[in-house]
Amino acid sequence: MAQDSALPLLPVAPTYVSWRDQQIATYQAGTGRPVLLIHSINAAASAFEMREPFQRLSRQFAVHALDLLGYGNSSRPPWRYRAAIYVDLITAMLDRIGEPTALVASSLGAAYAVLAAARRPQLVSRLALICPTGIGQLDRGPGIAAYTVYQLLRSPFGRVLYEALTTRASIRIFLASQAYANPDNITLDRLEGFYQTCRRPGAYYAPICFLSGLLNCDIAPTFATLPQPTLVVWGSDAKTSPLALASNFVRTRVATKVVTINQASLLVQDEQPEAFMAQVGPFLASP
C-alpha cells in the first residue's frame, strides 16, 4: 500500500514488512523495553483501537503495533483465514523485535497472543489481555457448519450483507452495543476511523472468516501452563464478552490476575485510557 494512501490509524506512519508475500503495516514509537500491541478481530478492527495505549506507553517503552493481515493498512488478500495465520504472524513479529516483549492484546487477538507466547516463551516477558476470548467463548474449532457459513458469506449475498453491516449507521450501532459503555464516547472522529478501515479494497475477506467461526481457537490447554505473568483487564459493562467470562481464565490458571475497569465495555483501553493505564502501566514496568 502506498504510504500516502495509508489510513491515519496511529500518530506515526506505518512501516511495511513483507510476510508470506504480503505487506504488514507496523508502527513503532518510544524507547525502552519493548511492548507489542495486538488489536481485536471484527469487521472494523485495526491498530486504530490501540491508539491510546500506543501514545501513552511510548513515553516509557518502545511500543510496537501492527495491523493484522486483512485489516487496517496491511494487505487484504482473498484468503480463507484461520487462527493459525495470526498466531504465525504474531510469532514473526516477536522474532523481528528479537528481545523479550510484553504483549498487550484484545479479544480474539489476545487468544492468538497467548498461543504465540507459548510458542516463543523466551521472547514474551508478560501479557496484558483485554476482554480475552478462547476459553468459554469463540473456542470451538471450525467444523462443517463453519465452512458452510463461510461459503455462503463468500457469495454475492455475503458481500451485500457485509456492505449493510459496515455502513456508518451500522458501525455506530455495533460500537454502542458492544464496544463502548457510553454511546457519547463514540465521537465523529472515532466513528470515521472505524468506518474507513471497513471500506478498503479486500476489507471483507478476513471478517467473513471471523463471522463464520473459522478464526476461533481453544487456548485453555495452553493458557493453563503459560509461564509468563498475566494480567486480564475487563470492562465492567462488556456485553458480548461479559465480565463473568473472566472466571474461566482464573479457573484455568489460578495465578491469573483480573482487574475490572468501570464504565467501559470491550474497548476498555480506548474508552477509559487513564484507568487502563493505571493498571497496565505498572504491570508492564514490573521487573
Which residues are covered by each model-predicted region?
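Catalytic active-site module of serine/aspartate enzymes centered on a nucleophile-bearing elbow/loop
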Residues: 254-287
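Conserved HGGG/HGGXW glycine-rich cap/lid loop of the alpha/beta-hydrolase fold
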Residues: 22-73
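Conserved hydrolase catalytic core segment
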Residues: 99-141
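Conserved alpha/beta-hydrolase catalytic His-Asp/Glu region
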Residues: 138, 163-224
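Conserved loop-alpha-helix segment in the C-terminal half of the alpha/beta-hydrolase fold
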Residues: 225-264
